[in-house]
Structures are given as structure tokens and as C-alpha cells.
């Protein structure tokens, strides 16, 4: 079986709100049977609106600074930080830095639905 390589610059990103682009790098379209992974690019001030999933989501910030929301708690994180949003728990992120933030995301399923939640953070 050949290696299925995803070149991030060749992937069409999808807008996830003003200043936020998500690129799925591994999912069912790349042959995955049980995982979805991707990269989210947030421009300064860009916000991933609060939402939930039926499954957990792992996140790792590789560049920039974010204010994150998980449940009813917030924190400010810098590159080199990872966190988990358990299944059905509201979470979101806002770029509070001066430059682009780059976030790696991963889910333990190829079926990932997002459900918006109307909360402020």
C-alpha cells in the first residue's frame, strides 16, 4: 500500500469564521478508518467559536498565543502547549498574539460533527 501524504500547502482550507482557516490533513478522504487530524490557522483576533463534539478533541498549539475555553474555564497558552476537550464539552479559542497562531487538532473518529454553543469567553 502506498504512503498517503498530505501536503498542507496543497489542501484547500475551509473558513471556520473570520480569520480562521482549517485544513483537514488526515480523514476518511485520505484513507483513515478511525482518526481525523488537521491544522487550524488563526490570524490575530481570529476566533474558533465555542462548540462541542460528540467525541473528544486533542489540540496542540505549535505557533502563537491563544486564549482557550474548555468547559467553563479559560486559560492563555503559548506554543508548545497541548490540551483536551472531552466529548460534549464546550471549547473554543481566540488568537491573542500579534502573529498567526497554528493549532494541530485530532479526533478519534472519521465522523466529526461540530455543534455551536452560544457562550462568551
Summary of predicted features, one role per range:
Residues 44, 54-55, 73, 89-90, ...:
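A generic "binding-loop/recognition-motif" signal
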Residues 40, 84, 99-114:
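A short hydrophobic beta-strand segment most commonly corresponding to one strand
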Residues 72-87:
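Short acidic-glycine-tyrosine-enriched beta hairpin
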Residues 38-53:
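Conserved short histidine dyad/triad with adjacent acidic residue
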Amino acid at each position: 500500500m502506498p504512503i498517503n501524504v498530505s501536503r498542507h500547502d496543497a489542501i484547500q482550507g475551509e473558513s471556520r469564521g473570520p480569520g480562521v482557516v482549517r485544513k483537514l490533513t488526515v480523514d476518511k478522504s485520505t484513507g483513515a478508518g478511525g482518526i481525523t487530524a488537521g491544522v487550524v490557522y488563526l490570524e490575530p483576533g481570529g476566533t474558533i467559536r465555542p462548540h462541542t463534539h460528540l467525541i473528544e478533541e486533542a489540540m496542540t498549539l505549535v505557533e502563537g498565543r491563544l486564549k482557550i475555553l474548555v468547559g467553563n474555564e479559560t486559560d492563555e497558552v503559548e506554543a508548545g502547549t497541548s490540551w483536551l476537550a472531552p466529548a460534549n464539552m464546550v471549547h473554543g479559542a481566540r488568537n491573542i498574539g500579534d502573529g498567526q497562531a497554528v493549532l494541530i487538532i485530532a479526533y478519534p473518529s472519521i465522523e466529526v460533527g461540530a455543534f455551536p454553543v452560544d457562550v462568551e469567553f
